[in-house]
Amino acid sequence: MEKFPGYLEFDGARQQSFLYPLFFREYIYVLAYDHGLNRLNRNRSFFLENTDYDKKYSSLIVKRLILRMYEQNRLIIPTKDLNQNSFLGHTSLFYYQMISVLFAVIVEIPFSKRLGSSFQGKQLKKSYNLQSIHSIFPFLEDKLAHFNCVLDVLIPYPIHLEILVQTLRYRVKDASSLHFFRFCLYEYCNWKNFDKKKKSILNPRFLLFLYNSHVCEYESIFFFLRKRSSHFRSTSYQVLFERILFYGKIQHFFKVFVNNFPAILGLLKDPFIHYVRYHGRCILATKDTPLLMNKWKYYFVNLWQCYFSLWFQSQKVNINQLSKDNLEFLGYLSSLRLNPLVVRSQMLENSFLIDNVRINLDSKIPISAIIGSLAKDKFCNVLGHPISKATWTDSSDSDILNRFVRICRNISHYYSGSSKKKNLYRIKYILRLCCVKTLARKHKSTVRAFLKRLGSGLLEEFLTGEDQVLSLIFPRSYYASKRLYRVRIWYLDIIYLNDLVNHE
């Protein structure tokens, strides 16, 4: 990046176009396809999520394709001829897939420069588990215990393509880039409607950029209003993108909001609101009354419907009182548990009892949802009874055993922070018996005869897997004690929950 400052500077009047280097510059291809850009993005992985490139995507082919699209009668490709038109040995569907990859590379460069400039002069804390979803659990365990009301919001995604285009319009000043972006999206949807059995032709990197831009637009407005409506200024959210007419729209929104609903704005002022977002959902936690959460619910519905032109039903925003309801978040069912504690105090000759209530965050395992997932993957039936994994019988015995051990170990690590381990033991039992039935089916034997022939040493891998991990954390004497099964152990190395087989 430092070697080509003139080709990456987008602030000049002559270089406002995001696609300007894609049309006219050659150095951007070398930079984008080189591993140097990947190394830069990995260093900035705290704000960008990037995927690797496929070697079959050539930036030179993309440039020739764009030049061909500008020729006469080449701009619109009929849907019925999508699989028939060919260019350089590829079908027309492959064109849009390559364009989506290169488009994501181009638009990420100026955004990464803006984000990098916002962090200049600020010391960032180094963390070795930036991708860990478990890093949120200590926060939930420390903070949610002091709150009593949580607003659970399902973030809607726009179903119309123009909403995504309009969202990018506030950041992208170039009209030609937006028209080109709109053209690719509509061609993709036309092809998808033509053949719904095919998988998506757009690159995951491109789809991830669309989703992040949509969520960033929503969160920037939310945090801006949250900061203005609070007695104390929030400092946790530091990155805000620059957009055209953003502050003018916010002032207009405030003007309409204050004039029409003067009493509601005062009710939104609460400095003790915590915001967490994960996988298309977000929660707002507070220790105030449910009346405040009702006002925030009303705010979310109007924000999505008025600002983003999305039909957002109020049923997608749930108000949970942790003392009564369970909060389903991050694969756990969380609630507040009241533990009464009686303390005897004696002062001189008088003694009296003091009743104290201790509040703990009770995190349970959603056993029904996990059994449903295991049944969907043919590990058991819908009732939780283990069955053999027929698709794995062609593998070797060691491969089958290692797969089951990895799944069981990762589930044990993920749900080790649960306050009740009974459901975790049930899941382990299902996986162990499923492993035995799979091996017995492969060797054309019954489960009893198979276990009798091999002995109990077959299942030692399931039992010693946790021993090797926990012995690195606790002394052997502490591990041998029964207190370990009543302690919450948060593992900070689990990245994917669904990809249990491939995670090492």
Swiss-Prot record:
Described purpose of this protein according to its UniProt entry: Usually encoded in the trnK tRNA gene intron. Probably assists in splicing its own and other chloroplast group II introns.
Source organism (scientific name): Capsella bursa-pastoris (Shepherd's purse)
Gene Ontology cellular-component terms listed: chloroplast
A biological-process GO annotation: mRNA processing
Family: Belongs to the intron maturase 2 family. MatK subfamily.
Alphabetized InterPro entries for the sequence: Domain_X, Maturase_MatK, Maturase_MatK_N
Lineage, opening ranks: Eukaryota, Viridiplantae, Streptophyta, Embryophyta, Tracheophyta
GO molecular function, one term: RNA binding
Subcellular location(s) of the protein: Plastid, Chloroplast
Source organism superkingdom: Eukaryota
Keywords tagged on the record: Chloroplast, mRNA processing, Plastid, RNA-binding, tRNA processing
Protein's name in the database: Maturase K
Pfam families tied to this protein: Intron_maturas2 (PF01348), MatK_N (PF01824)
